[in-house]
Amino acid sequence: MLLIESFYEGVRAATDQLELDFGYRTKSRLRAKLASGDEVGLFLPRGTILRGGQKLQARDGRVVEVVAAPEDLLEVRCADPLELARAAYHLGNRHVAVELGDGWLRIQADHVLEGMLIGLGAEVLPLRAPFEPEAGAYAHGHQHPGDGSGARIHMMGGQ
């Protein structure tokens, strides 16, 4: 089994891919299969959240790219920004992982939350797409200098 214990920060292209949904990308210890079919064991620092496009360094020198797998999501749209902010508030109040976009929110599919959002007047559409939610104010994710993931107001914790 291929072992991965660190991130790759160089310029070499990845030689394989590791496709994982968001739930698996939050696990620091994981056994999975690469696109090539090779088994891989992840032993990353606790609290790591993998993002699509990140590169990992295997013990044997191989570079593996993380791919955010498509999953069942709900896209939330509202008639105006205040209603969208209200929907985001209620999701945040329930500690729901939320991906933010221009005029929309995305969450993992959940019929209870879907009902709540419809009750708030939101338009809720099911879709299948990669899920890249906000890290949260207290997250301790891994970032790369120069990749556009530098500290921002919504990434205040321990960067």
Swiss-Prot record:
Domain of life of the organism encoding this protein: Bacteria
Subcellular location: Cytoplasm
CC per GO annotation: cytoplasm
GO molecular function annotations of the record: nickel cation binding; unfolded protein binding
GO biological process terms on file: protein folding; protein-containing complex assembly; urea metabolic process
Pfam families for this protein: UreE_C, UreE_N
CDD domains per UniProt: UreE
Keywords per UniProt: Chaperone, Cytoplasm, Nickel, Nickel insertion
Record-linked InterPro entries: UreE, UreE_C_dom, UreE_N, UreE_N_sf
Record-stated family: Belongs to the UreE family.
Function field: Involved in urease metallocenter assembly. Binds nickel. Probably functions as a nickel donor during metallocenter assembly.
Protein name: Urease accessory protein UreE
